[in-house]
From Swiss-Prot:
Keywords: DNA replication, DNA-binding, Viral DNA replication. Signal peptide: none annotated. The sliding-clamp-loader consists of 4 large subunits and 1 small subunit. Interacts with the sliding clamp; this interaction allows the sliding-clamp-loader to open the sliding clamp. Part of the replicase complex that includes the DNA polymerase, the polymerase clamp, the clamp loader complex, the single-stranded DNA binding protein, the primase, the helicase and the helicase assembly factor. It comes from Enterobacteria phage T4. Forms the sliding-clamp-loader together with the small subunit. The clamp loader holds the clamp in an open conformation and places it onto the DNA. One of its GO terms (molecular function) is DNA clamp loader activity. Belongs to the Tevenvirinae sliding-clamp-loader small subunit family. GO terms for biological process: bidirectional double-stranded viral DNA replication; DNA replication. Pfam families: Phage_clamp_A (PF16790). It comes from the Viruses. This is Sliding-clamp-loader small subunit.
Length: 187
């Protein structure tokens, strides 16, 4: 309470503005924003649970929404259709179509991730380095050598290329590097 009746109490936004502390002004303005990840999960939740959600003020990413829904088989027809024709639609129309087409349900789970076999990556990188070709050609070389039964002979010749620096290019995991080095010595 002020001693004088003429004193006006300023809120944090006004204090920041009058003091021309622009970082404080920005942080005060940011306090009204929702985090992008919360908005994303709110949008996905609205599609899954068929609840109303206004996306006019939200950061709507068609790609991320389609990617999230494509992790579940029952959503694939709707996601496939949007992948083909949805790029020309507005965000609101895209959202409305998915609201209508995706079946209602709880969808929780980890997203699918690519898991590469470090041994395969080592062999492909060795072949690419030896024959000075790109990764796709090295994969073709590997299949041809395997078919002809010559892959073990070639790997025996190439084990000298397996150095610590080369293994760092293959994987950053130190434990895997040691295992790959041990494997290469056994060739």
């Amino acid at each position: 309470m002020s001693l004088f009746k003429d004193d006006i109490q300023l809120n944090e936004h006004q204090v920041a503005w009058y003091s021309k502390d622009w970082t404080a002004v920005q942080s005060a303005a940011d306090s009204f924003k929702e985090k992008a990840e919360n908005e994303f999960f709110e949008i996905i939740g609205a599609i899954n649970n068929k609840t109303k959600c206004s996306i006019a003020q939200k950061d709507y990413s068609k790609f991320m929404v389609e990617n999230a829904l494509s992790q579940f088989p029952e959503c694939m027809p709707a996601v496939y259709a949007m992948n083909l024709i949805g790029s020309g639609l507005s965000d609101e129309a895209h959202f409305n179509y998915l609201m209508a087409a995706v079946p209602r349900g709880k969808r929780y789970g980890k997203w699918a991730k690519l898991v590469e076999d470090s041994t395969e990556v080592l062999i492909i990188k060795l072949l690419a380095k030896r024959y000075q070709v790109n990764t796709n050609d090295a994969i073709n070389y590997k299949s041809i050598l395997t078919k002809n039964g010559k892959l073990p002979l070639v790997l025996k010749e190439l084990k000298g290329l397996v150095t610590d620096d080369f293994l760092k290019e293959v994987t950053k995991n130190v434990k895997e590097q040691k295992q790959l080095k041990k494997l290469a010595l056994e060739w």
